[in-house]
C-alpha cells in the first residue's frame, strides 16, 4: 500500500518539529473564539466617524502556526482630496469619502466601486451605528453567540463576519495546544482593561499610510497581475512569538521595509552567534546606497567611500575593551543602529569613550552633508536620546545603513518610533511573549499565497466567475517574475463553481509545483467563502526556487 504523505501544512518550515495535537480538531472551538476576539479587538480601535477617517480594517487575515501567529492588516489609503460635502441624509452615500474604504477584495482598498450591497452599507451619523441593506444573506445570518453575550462589542468590519470563518485563520492551529491557549485572549482583553492602549498614536499613524511612490519594474507587474493590487498597497504584519516559558530579554525588531532594503533586519544576530560568523554577518551589512540630490556619480562614490571609512572605524571600536555580547537591532527610517544591551560591557577606559564621542560627531557631520536635511539629524539625535545613549555611552556600537532613494521622510516619524516601542513593550510584557511588529510593502503579489487565495475568494463571492478566467488572470505574468525566484503556482477551487448543480474541484498549475519534496520552498494558504450556491474553498501553493533565494512574505522575506 502507498504511504500516506503528510499534509503540506505540516511540511512547512514554520510547522516542523511541532506537536501533532495542534492539527487535530479537539481545540477547534477555543481557537475560533480567540480568532473572533482578535478581530473584535482590532476593529474596535479608533472606529471611523463622519468627521474622522479612523482605523478602517480593510482586511484582517490571521494565520496560526505552531511557533508564531501572523496578523495581516490590509489598510485602505486615505483619499488624496476630501471634497466638501453638503449636508444630506446619512442614507445617501453617493460621493462620500468614507464609503471608499469599504471592506472587499484587495482592489476595494483603492476603489470605491463595488456591488450594490456594498454601496448600500455605509456609516451612520453615530460612531457605533451602521445602516445596512437587508437582503436574504443577512437575514439568514447566524450569530456565533447571542447579542447579550457580545461583551467585547463584536462588530467585525471584515468580510468574514458569517458563521463560517476562513480556514486560513486556523490552518495549523497554533492555539490548539493548551500551552498557548491564553496568549491571544490576553491580547483581546487589553482593549477592555487599558484605556491608554486605545489612545496610542501608533494606530493613528501606522494604520493611515500616506501615498507613497513605487518605482521599479515591479509596479507595472502589479498592475497587470491582479487587477486588485496597486503598487502602493501597504499592510502591517504583527507577529507574536510564543516563548512563554523562556522569554528572551531583548527588544523585538521593528522592520520598516518602506525605507530599509530587504534583508537588513535580521533577528538571527541575537544570541548564541559565534564571533567569526557575527563579524562576517555584520561586515556583510556594510553596504550603502546613498542617493543625494546631485546626479554626479563621482561625487556620490566619494561620499560613499568616506562614509564607509567612518563606519569601519565604528566597527573596529565596537568591541574594544569588552567581550562580544548579544546585540539588538533598531532600524530607523533607513538608518540601522546597533546598540549593546544596557548594562553590558561598560567602558571604564576614558580613551574609548572619547574616541566614540568623536566618531559619533564625525558620523553626524557626514550624514548631514550627505543627506542635506537638518530634520534628519534632529531625528537621529532624538532617537539616540531615546535609547539613553546621550548621557551614558555604554557599549555603544554603531553601524549605519542608509537607503534614501529620493524619498521624503514622513512627518512625525520619530513619534511613530516612540509609539512602536511602547506598543512593543506593552504587548510583550502583558502577554509574556516576544512581539514583533512589522510594516511590509507589497512589491509582488506572488510574495504570499494568502494574498492570492483571499483575492480569489472575493471574486467567487461577488461574481459567478469561472475558474479559468480567474486562473488566467493570475498566471499570465508569472514568466516575468520567474527569474526572481518563483518556480510555479498551483491553484485549486472546490464547490459549486459558476452555479453548477454538482460540486466539483478544478485545479490549475503553472510551472513546477512539487508537493512531495521536503526541502522544497512552498508557501501554502487556504481560503473559504460563502456564496449563494454554498461554500467554496480555495487552495494556493507557490513554489520558490532553491538557487535564486525566492521566498514568501509569510517568512518575512521578499522576492
UniProtKB/Swiss-Prot annotation:
InterPro entries on file: KH_sf_prok-type, Ribosomal_S3_C_sf, Ribosomal_uS3_C, Ribosomal_uS3_CS, Ribosomal_uS3m_plant
Keyword Ribonucleoprotein: yes
Region spans: Disordered: 113-134
PANTHER family reported for this sequence: RIBOSOMAL PROTEIN S3, MITOCHONDRIAL, SMALL RIBOSOMAL SUBUNIT PROTEIN US3M
Native source organism of the sequence: Zea mays
GO molecular function: RNA binding; structural constituent of ribosome
GO cellular component: mitochondrion; ribonucleoprotein complex; ribosome
Gene Ontology BP, a term: translation
Gene giving rise to this polypeptide: RPS3
Family per similarity comment: Belongs to the universal ribosomal protein uS3 family.
Family matches, as Pfam families: Ribosomal_S3_C
Assigned keywords, A-Z: Mitochondrion, Ribonucleoprotein, Ribosomal protein
Broad class of where this protein is predominantly found: mitochondrion
Localization in the cell: Mitochondrion
Signal peptide start and end residues: none
Protein name according to UniProt: Small ribosomal subunit protein uS3m
